[in-house]
């Protein structure tokens, strides 16, 4: 089985680094024309050069700040006035870590805009062209915490659950246009974000960061943290024709971390 995404255009959120950029590289390697989305222009420019060297094709980027949802919507709407895409990967940076008892009301509002509203706005803008083409893939990168909340991630646990519910609802309504919508429940992956969270947790509990990683790895039946490339393979499959009958599901990729069925 060879995944061929030639003549497909993909918009990939949060793709200056981490899981987002791993996905961008994999989709580009499969033949897609990708548009990277991030607020870090220096990294975006660097990545575009790397993708050109990897694929021999031109790719693009969109400079946005997810933390300003109003400006983000304006930029996204402007982009889709002249562009259509086939594949949308909804992904943003994560919200601040913290315990539920210490979260302010304003934090919920900010995280709602960051994780939920940006996802809705991007999807609604993208889906118009997908309907015209009678083909589309929308993939929401969420977290295993929507099924089993993780400690010290109150904001993420709460708002990502709304994203997955919304994604399921969208899948019901968009299926007749041959557009699939799926949610990826992400486990522990070797990224800068995970390093940051573990450093914060180490300070909070006065232990070494290496101990946090060791305990985290022990929680996973495979006894290790995942690599971004492993995540990207799943996204490439879901973006392809091979996934044409997979719709409206929450797919964990976590090394067996979730205990639920």
Please name every model-derived segment.
Residues 4, 18, 148, 236, ...:
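Short C-terminal tail/terminal secondary-structure segment
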Residues 9, 16-18:
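Conserved glycine-rich cofactor-binding loop
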Residues 175, 180, 246-248:
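Short, small/polar-rich loop/turn modules that mediate ligand/substrate recognition or access, typified
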């Amino acid at each position: 089985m060879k995944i061929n995404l030639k003549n497909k255009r993909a918009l990939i959120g949060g793709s200056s680094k981490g899981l987002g950029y791993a996905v961008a590289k994999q989709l580009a390697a499969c033949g897609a024309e990708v548009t990277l989305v991030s607020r870090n222009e220096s990294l975006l420019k660097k990545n575009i050069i790397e993708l050109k060297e990897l694929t021999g094709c031109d790719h693009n980027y969109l400079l946005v700040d997810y933390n300003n949802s109003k400006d983000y919507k304006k930029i996204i709407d402007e982009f889709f006035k002249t562009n259509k895409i086939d594949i949308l990967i909804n992904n943003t940076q994560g919200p601040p870590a913290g315990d539920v008892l210490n979260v302010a009301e304003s934090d919920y509002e900010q995280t709602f805009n960051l994780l939920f509203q940006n996802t809705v706005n991007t999807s609604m803008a993208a889906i118009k062209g997908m309907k015209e083409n009678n083909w589309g893939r929308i993939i929401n990168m969420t977290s295993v915490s929507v099924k089993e909340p993780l400690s010290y991630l109150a904001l993420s646990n709460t708002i990502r659950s709304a994203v997955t519910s919304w994604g399921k609802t969208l899948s019901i309504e968009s299926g007749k246009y041959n557009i699939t919508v799926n949610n990826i429940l992400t486990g522990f992956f070797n990224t800068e974000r995970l390093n940051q969270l573990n450093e914060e947790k180490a300070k909070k509990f006065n232990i070494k960061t290496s101990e946090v990683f060791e305990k985290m790895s022990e929680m996973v039946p495979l006894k290790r943290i995942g690599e971004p490339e492993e995540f990207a393979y799943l996204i490439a499959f879901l973006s392809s024709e091979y996934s044409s009958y997979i719709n409206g599901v929450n797919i964990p990729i976590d090394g067996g971390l979730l205990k639920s069925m």
